[in-house]
Amino acid sequence: ALSSAASDVYKRQAYNNIEKNEAWLAAAKSTIDFIEAHCFDSDGRMYFEVTAEGTPLRKRRYIFSESFAAIAMSEYAIASGDQTYAVKALDLFKRMQYFMETPGILAPKYLDTLPMKGHSITMILINVASRIRQAIQDESFNGQIDASIDQLRKDFMHPEFKALLETVGPNGEF
């Protein structure tokens, strides 16, 4: 099985931050091509796992695959100078927001009998927005970043425990 998007993020970040190694850039482009050809379902959501040949194995209820793909596309745009990948990352980010805001698209983690929420999506949105903002030089992503930080502070940060809690009740209660 292959988790392409996450692997690709590391290759691009290595190229952008460690060494301008053309082999890394070529590997990143190959991975992006694979992601685009094999990792999206017809509903616009991504598979979580596919085989090396691109056969889908598993699709999850959350948007982490989409998040890593958007980060990968942003990093590739920065590394290669090809802004079409920044636009693709932006489009994917907007699709992620639609998935999160539209009831029924993403299955809830818990049934209503266990009302709680986690910080994982909130935190990954900071990273995704930051990377796309860097790729397209668009300060409008500050709103998403600020909203995510505000939600972390309001609901998940608990100074009484000297901790940022991973899961809390619907209103941030422990």
Residue ranges and their predicted role:
Residues 27-44, 88-105, 145-163:
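Long, well-ordered core segments of solenoidal/helical folds
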Residues 15-29, 76-90, 133-146:
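Structural helix-adjacent loops and short alpha-helical linkers that scaffold large soluble proteins
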Residues 1, 44-65, 105-124, 161-174:
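Carbohydrate-binding/catalytic loop surfaces
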Residues 1-10:
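Single conserved hydrophobic/aromatic residue that forms the stacking wall/gate
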Residues 24, 29-78:
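Well-ordered mid-protein domain cores that form the structural environment of catalytic cofactors
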Residues 60-107, 114-118, 125:
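Internal, well-ordered domain-core segments that constitute the primary functional module
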Residues 120-174:
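Loop-centered beta-sheet repeat module
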